[in-house]
């Protein structure tokens, strides 16, 4: 899982480095109860003013949520497969706060979707060449169980 995290962090670092000076902070472990989640903060000192649309297009989807390499063709394939499988087209998004000339953005990779009395908790896992199927299924189960336990179901 560290390797999957590094794919995401390195991809974001590469995309953001075109905007200005970047600093990647040491990888940390976030304890989320039954889940362990890796977190790597990246600071960017923008060389010029950027639009929110530009920042979002660089951040989303990360390889944790979409294909790598991310091209218009691979994104179209992903959307097509999700549509055919009845999956949500997206289940994560950048979220940010702009204040006093500074911006803090994170990329949320979890989702809970309510529609009437129905609640959906889509989840996925990263699949890279070194992935082991048993570990990926376990990761999916733990993600879903953690959300269920938060809601007491």
Please identify what each model-predicted range represents.
Residues 1-81, 152:
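Contiguous alpha-helical scaffold segments within structured protein domains
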Residues 70-153:
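Glycine-rich, small/acidic residue-mixed loop/short-helix segments
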């Amino acid at each position: 899982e560290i390797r999957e995290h590094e794919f995401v962090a390195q991809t974001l670092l590469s995309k953001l480095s075109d905007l200005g000076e970047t600093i990647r902070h040491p990888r940390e472990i976030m304890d989320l109860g039954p889940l362990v989640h890796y977190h790597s903060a990246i600071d960017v000192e923008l060389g010029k003013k950027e639009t929110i649309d530009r920042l979002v297009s660089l951040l989303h989807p990360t390889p944790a949520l979409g294909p790598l390499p991310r091209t218009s063709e691979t994104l179209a394939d992903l959307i097509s497969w999700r549509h055919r499988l009845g999956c949500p087209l997206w289940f994560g998004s950048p979220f940010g706060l702009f204040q006093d000339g500074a911006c803090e953005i994170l990329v949320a990779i979890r989702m809970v979707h309510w529609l009437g009395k129905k609640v959906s908790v889509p989840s996925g896992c990263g699949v890279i060449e070194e992935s082991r199927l048993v570990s990926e299924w376990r990761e999916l189960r733990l993600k879903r169980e953690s959300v269920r336990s938060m809601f007491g179901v």
